[in-house]
């Protein structure tokens, strides 16, 4: 399920269709129910573990790790454009897309670069959310980071802050690692 969810959002965006809205509309209620189930486990006084019925894939999973800095996790591309692009146009676009990207809004990059209908940028754009989702899933499954409780933050909460708010310092560190990885993937 993580792979399908992670693939569909950027795949739809590649064609100019708002993937987060389409996929979120279909799976959002399930992810929110999973978040509430995790909160119920905590409210009952039990430890939030898989053995106690904890759910790994929640709304926080999607918002803070699959769609962080926007669909396709484009902050790596933005950083590359700002510091390493040879074209003045790309540098300027990176600067313009940087602040919105920190609030998980990346349409300036999607349409300005363009990533939409660009097969060369489609590969990292589609791959990065899958990589992020798999790293997070296995990190939670083996206990490197805690499961998501019921804490929900708005999807526009900046990265690292959002990781800390929904999962503590370990989640913020993992989110930082994944964001750094996005630079190398792009």
Where are these regions (language model features)?
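Transmembrane alpha-helical segments and their short flanking loops
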Residues: 39-59, 76-78, 96-99, 110-186
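A residue-level detector for conformationally permissive "hinge/kink" positions
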Residues: 8, 93-96
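Juxtamembrane helix-boundary/capping and inter-helix hinge elements in multi-pass membrane proteins
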Residues: 84-91, 114-120
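Generic multipass alpha-helical transmembrane bundles of integral membrane proteins
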Residues: 1-84
């Amino acid at each position: 399920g993580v792979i399908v969810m992670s693939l569909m959002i950027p795949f739809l965006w590649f064609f100019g269709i708002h993937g987060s809205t389409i996929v979120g509309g279909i799976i959002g209620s399930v992810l929110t129910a999973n978040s509430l189930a995790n909160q119920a486990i905590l409210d009952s006084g039990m430890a939030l573990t898989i053995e106690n019925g904890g759910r790994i894939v929640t709304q926080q999973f999607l918002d803070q790790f699959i769609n962080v800095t926007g669909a396709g996790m484009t902050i790596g591309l933005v950083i590359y454009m700002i510091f390493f692009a040879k074209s003045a146009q790309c540098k300027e676009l990176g600067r313009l897309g940087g602040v919105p990207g920190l609030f998980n809004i990346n349409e300036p990059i999607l349409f300005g670069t363009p990533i939409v209908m660009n097969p060369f940028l489609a590969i990292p754009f589609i791959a990065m959310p899958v990589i992020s989702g798999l790293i997070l899933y296995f990190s939670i499954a083996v206990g490197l980071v805690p499961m998501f409780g019921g804490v929900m933050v708005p999807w526009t909460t900046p990265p690292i802050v959002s990781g800390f708010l929904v999962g503590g310092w370990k989640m913020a560190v993992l989110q930082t690692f994944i964001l750094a990885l996005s630079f190398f993937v792009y």
